C-alpha cells in the first residue's frame, strides 16, 4: 500500500475552521471523473483490530479532503479533514480519537468497534481555475469480519409434538444477514418452522423427530461469513395426560371412604396430587399408597370436595389431569328459624322461614303443636289470633344421607289488637 506519512500539524475543529470548510463546500461543482477508489486493508477486520481505508488514484493539485462517517455531509458526521497547504488536520464531532488521516487521503481506524461499521464518505477538493474548486464524493462501507455465531435455545429438551422452542443466532450483528440450516440443508419454511423479520430468531412449533435438528445458523456480510456449531434438540417422549379414577363420586360426610387413583401406571413417573390448585399437604387424615399414585380419604368432609388433580412427572417436567370434584353428601344441620322474635299481637301476619345446610337440599315441613301444617321452607298465617299461640316446629330431612333434624319455637299471641 506504500509508505504513509501523517501531516505534522493537527487541530480540533474551530469556528474559523468551520468557516473554511463551509467556504470549500460552497464552491463544490459536479464530481470529478477521476477513478478514485477506496479499499479496506485488511479486507476482513475483526473487532479490536486496525483497518486502513486506502485511497487509490488520488488526483493531483489538491486543496484538501474531508472524511465523513455515513453519507450525510454535515457537521455532526464530520470526522476529520486535511488541508494540503500547511499540512493541517482538523477534527470534527464524529472524531473518536482513533482515526488518523494521512497525506494520501487514507484513513486509519484503530481498535475497531461495531460502532465503526457502516458507510464513510470522502470528499476531495481539487484546485480550480480561480473561480472555485472541483470536488469528488466517494463512499465506502466498512464491514467487520463476522464472529463465529452460537445458537441459544429457550428449551433444549422439548416434549415431542407439544412444546414450542425458540432458537436465536448470537450475537446480534449490525449490517449482517442470518441464514439457518437444518440437517445440512437450507431451512424449509412450514407452519411449524417460522423465522423472525430479521431471520435471527427461529420459532419451532410442536417439535418432532423431523424438526429436532441438527440446526446451524450463519452470519454473513459482504466480506465474510461464519457458521455456528450444530445444535440438536433432545426430544423428550410425550407424557400421556393422566386421568383420575375414583370409587365413589358421591361420598357421605364422615362416613364413606373415597379412593382416588392416578392413571396410567408407570414406574418411570412420579405422582403429585393437587387440591384447589395447591399441592396437597401431608396430613394424617390423608393416606397415600403405591408411590403416591393412590390417594385415600378415610372420611370425607364437606370442605374436601375439591377439585382434585393428579400430575405425572419425569425429571424434565410434568402434566396434570383434568380436575375432579366430589359431590359430598352431608346434612341436614340443625335448622334455623327466622325471625327470632316470638311475641305477636292479634291481627298481625305471621311469617316464619326455616333453613338448614344440606347437600342435596333438605325437605322441609312445619308442625304446630305436633300437628302437620305444610311442606316447604316458609310458613305464613295472616291475621293471627290467640288461638295461633303454640309450638311451631321445622323438621328437615335429607333422603341421600338418611339424616333428619328439627328446630322449634314457641309463639305467643296476645289478645290486644293493633289500632
Swiss-Prot record:
Cell inner membrane listed as a keyword: no
Q: Where is this motif: Cell attachment site?
A: 127-129
Q: Which domain of life is it from?
A: Eukaryota
Q: List the disulfide bonds.
A: 169-217, 262-310, 354-394
Subcellular localization: Secreted
**Residues in Ig-like C2-type domain copies:** 147-234, 240-327, 335-410
Instruction: Give glycosylation sites per the record.
Output: 61, 104, 111, 199, 209, 268, 303
What Pfam families does UniProt report for this protein, alphabetically?
Ig_2, Ig_3, V-set
Q: Name one GO biological process term.
A: female pregnancy
Keyword Signal in the entry? The reply is yes
The record's keywords, sorted A to Z, are: Disulfide bond, Glycoprotein, Immunoglobulin domain, Repeat, Secreted, Signal
Signal peptide range in chain numbering? 1-34
Q: What is its main location?
A: secreted
Where does the Ig-like V-type domain start and stop, copy by copy? 35-144
Note the InterPro entries from the entry: CEA_cell_adhesion (IPR050831), Ig-like_dom (IPR007110), Ig-like_dom_sf (IPR036179), Ig-like_fold (IPR013783), Ig_sub (IPR003599), Ig_sub2 (IPR003598), Ig_V-set (IPR013106)
Q: Which family does it belong to?
A: Belongs to the immunoglobulin superfamily. CEA family.
Query: What protein name is recorded for this chain?
Result: Pregnancy-specific beta-1-glycoprotein 7
Q: What high-level taxonomic lineage is stated for the organism?
A: Eukaryota, Metazoa, Chordata, Craniata, Vertebrata
Amino acid at each position: 500500500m506504500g509508505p504513509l506519512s501523517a501531516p505534522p500539524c493537527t487541530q480540533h475543529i474551530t469556528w474559523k475552521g468551520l468557516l473554511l470548510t463551509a467556504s470549500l463546500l460552497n464552491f463544490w461543482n459536479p464530481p470529478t471523473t477521476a477513478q478514485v477508489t477506496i479499499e479496506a486493508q485488511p479486507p476482513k477486520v475483526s473487532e479490536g483490530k486496525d483497518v486502513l481505508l486506502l485511497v487509490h488514484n488520488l488526483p493531483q493539485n489538491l486543496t484538501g479532503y474531508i472524511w465523513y462517517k455515513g453519507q450525510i455531509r454535515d457537521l455532526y458526521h464530520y470526522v476529520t479533514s486535511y488541508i494540503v497547504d500547511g499540512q493541517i488536520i482538523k477534527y470534527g464531532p464524529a472524531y473518536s480519537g482513533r482515526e488518523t488521516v494521512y497525506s494520501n487521503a487514507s484513513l486509519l481506524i484503530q481498535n475497531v468497534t461495531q460502532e465503526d461499521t457502516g458507510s464513510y464518505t470522502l470528499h476531495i477538493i481539487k484546485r480550480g481555475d480561480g473561480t472555485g474548486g472541483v470536488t469528488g464524493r466517494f463512499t465506502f462501507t466498512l464491514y467487520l469480519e463476522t464472529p463465529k455465531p452460537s445458537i441459544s435455545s429457550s428449551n433444549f429438551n422439548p416434549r415431542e409434538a407439544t412444546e414450542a422452542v425458540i432458537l436465536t443466532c448470537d450475537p446480534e450483528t449490525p449490517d449482517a444477514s442470518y441464514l439457518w440450516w437444518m440437517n445440512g440443508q437450507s431451512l424449509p419454511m412450514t407452519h411449524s418452522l417460522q423465522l423472525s423479520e430479521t431471520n435471527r430468531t427461529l420459532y419451532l412449533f410442536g417439535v418432532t423427530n423431523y424438526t429436532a435438528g441438527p440446526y446451524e445458523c450463519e452470519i454473513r456480510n459482504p466480506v465474510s461469513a461464519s457458521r455456528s456449531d450444530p445444535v440438536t434438540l433432545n426430544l423428550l417422549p410425550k407424557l400421556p395426560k393422566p386421568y383420575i379414577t375414583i370409587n365413589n363420586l358421591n361420598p357421605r360426610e364422615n362416613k364413606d371412604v373415597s379412593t382416588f387413583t392416578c392413571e396410567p401406571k408407570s414406574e418411570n413417573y412420579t405422582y403429585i396430587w393437587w387440591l384447589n390448585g395447591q399441592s396437597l399437604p401431608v396430613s394424617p387424615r390423608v393416606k397415600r399408597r403405591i408411590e403416591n399414585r393412590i390417594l385415600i380419604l378415610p372420611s370425607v368432609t364437606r370442605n374436601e370436595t375439591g377439585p382434585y388433580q393428579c400430575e405425572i412427572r419425569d425429571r424434565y417436567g410434568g402434566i396434570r389431569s383434568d380436575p375432579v370434584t366430589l359431590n359430598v353428601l352431608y346434612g341436614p344441620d340443625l335448622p334455623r328459624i327466622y325471625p327470632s322474635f316470638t311475641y305477636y299481637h292479634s291481627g298481625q301476619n305471621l311469617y316464619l322461614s326455616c333453613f338448614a345446610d344440606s347437600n342435596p337440599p333438605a325437605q322441609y315441613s312445619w308442625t304446630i303443636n305436633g300437628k302437620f301444617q305444610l311442606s316447604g321452607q316458609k310458613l305464613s298465617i295472616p291475621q293471627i289470633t290467640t288461638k295461633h299461640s303454640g309450638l311451631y316446629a321445622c323438621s328437615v330431612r335429607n333422603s341421600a344421607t338418611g339424616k333428619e333434624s328439627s328446630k322449634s319455637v314457641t309463639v305467643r299471641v296476645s289478645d290486644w289488637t293493633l289500632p
